[in-house]
């Protein structure tokens, strides 16, 4: 598995994976996804299967960060893994890279929302040190509940 930063030619495969992984109202629009990726205060990581000439996107993660008066905070916008590639450590590695990007940008904490029914994702976040901080009843297009999880980030690893 190759992990690398997003490149402009990745968008079609990235959005095809978005459509495969999420249905409305959870799925992001193309315009919103482009906006997230273009944000200079964000990082998008790609997990790519490299079988000779055939490269396929196995997953991706998008993290953003914002400077606030009490310090920079980060937010995991999404982590998505192709169904055929799940349970193989890809999401954990994408999460690690997203955290490293946020840490390098000065973030001292990282937050995310997760569908209350996404047991696999909840298990991953808990195993990586995230703690539930709340629940929003009408988060996903005001139709579905989500848990709020957060984790403190230490200083960048030297």
Language-model features and meaning:
Residues 5-84, 92-97, 101, 105, ...:
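Acetyl-CoA-dependent GNAT
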Residues 32-34, 134-137:
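Short, P/G- and charge-enriched loop/turn segments at secondary-structure junctions
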Residues 69, 82-96, 103-105, 109, ...:
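Conserved glycine-rich acetyl-CoA-binding loop
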């Amino acid at each position: 598995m190759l992990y690398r930063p997003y490149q402009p030619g990745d968008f079609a495969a990235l959005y095809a994976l978005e459509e495969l992984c999420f249905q409305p109202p959870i799925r992001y629009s193309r315009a919103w996804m482009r906006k997230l990726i273009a944000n200079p205060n964000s990082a998008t990581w790609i997990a790519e299967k490299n079988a000779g000439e055939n490269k396929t996107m196995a997953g991706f993660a998008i993290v953003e960060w914002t400077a606030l008066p009490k310090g920079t905070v980060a937010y995991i916008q999404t982590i998505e893994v192709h169904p055929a590639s799940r349970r193989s450590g890809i999401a954990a590695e994408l999460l690690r890279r997203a955290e490293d990007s946020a840490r390098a940008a000065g973030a001292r904490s990282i937050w995310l929302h997760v569908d209350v029914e996404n047991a696999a994702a909840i298990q991953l976040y808990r195993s990586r040190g995230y703690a539930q901080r709340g629940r929003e009843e009408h988060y996903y297009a005001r139709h579905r509940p989500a848990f709020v999880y957060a984790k403190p980030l230490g200083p960048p690893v030297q």
